[in-house]
């Protein structure tokens, strides 16, 4: 199937029975004048009637769970599961986006892309096959009115997308793929010559080039295939054709960064770790740690 056919087919996902009522709520949201602050909290403010404030809250509440954020929309504070500014602020000193074509693979509701607007990229394109996250993005962008393009596509579509990027962000995706080297090759195919990738993934401690292959779940996440040592990750990247591999940071996931709030449904990090030993998951594996790396395609 051609990429345009896939895009058309997936736009139909917005009519799924669990998504269509949310799209209807979104379609009833009026256009209003507002101010937008693209800081740690993406804040939308303005003088609106109380009835619209209530409509905003009810619409946002219906769109739970909110994984990335936070957002403040006319006083409705969307306290997302992740304090996404912690990761964004860690990466921001390392990138230059001005005048560049930028992609965010696995963009969720677009929090990082909204933040990136302050760097004046030429274009911003998000890839994520979730119609719920796309609807959350459309809700926020209804007020932000950005030119961000959001595609209901996955990383496997990047090579066929028809546009190449100067910078690609791929945060928290690699461990969900059963063939991580193939995924890294797809990302490389989406880069212009000299382009950069900012990648983060789970890792385990160790000097050997090996990877943990969890059973049914890792930290109660069902689709984690491989958790490599940093040396194994570097070898994967080399096998995918990346000669430049720079470690930017390593960091354990903390209760400050990821926690249960009323804006999500179900459990969060505190439920995923062994209560007797928070350095282990409930399955007995090493607790989640992330490594942040920069990859570069040769000119």
UniProtKB/Swiss-Prot annotation:
Q: Name one GO molecular function term.
A: transferase activity, transferring alkyl or aryl (other than methyl) groups
Q: Where does carboxy-S-adenosyl-L-methionine bind?
A: 68, 82, 87, 106, 128-130, 155-156, 175, 290
Q: Any one Gene Ontology biological process term?
A: tRNA wobble uridine modification
Q: Write down the EC number.
A: 2.5.1.-
Enumerate the Pfam families for this protein. Methyltransf_9
Q: Which UniProt keywords apply?
A: Transferase, tRNA processing
InterPro entries cross-referenced by the UniProt entry: CmoB, Mo5U34_MeTrfas-like, SAM-dependent_MTases_sf
Cysteine pairings via disulfide bonds: none
Per the record, what are the reactions this protein catalyses?
Answer: carboxy-S-adenosyl-L-methionine + 5-hydroxyuridine(34) in tRNA = 5-carboxymethoxyuridine(34) in tRNA + S-adenosyl-L-homocysteine + H(+)
Q: How does it assemble?
A: Homotetramer.
Entry's family note: Belongs to the class I-like SAM-binding methyltransferase superfamily. CmoB family.
- Summarize the protein's role: Catalyzes carboxymethyl transfer from carboxy-S-adenosyl-L-methionine (Cx-SAM) to 5-hydroxyuridine (ho5U) to form 5-carboxymethoxyuridine (cmo5U) at position 34 in tRNAs.
**Under which name does UniProt file this protein?**
tRNA U34 carboxymethyltransferase
- Which species is this UniProt entry from? Nitratiruptor sp. (strain SB155-2)
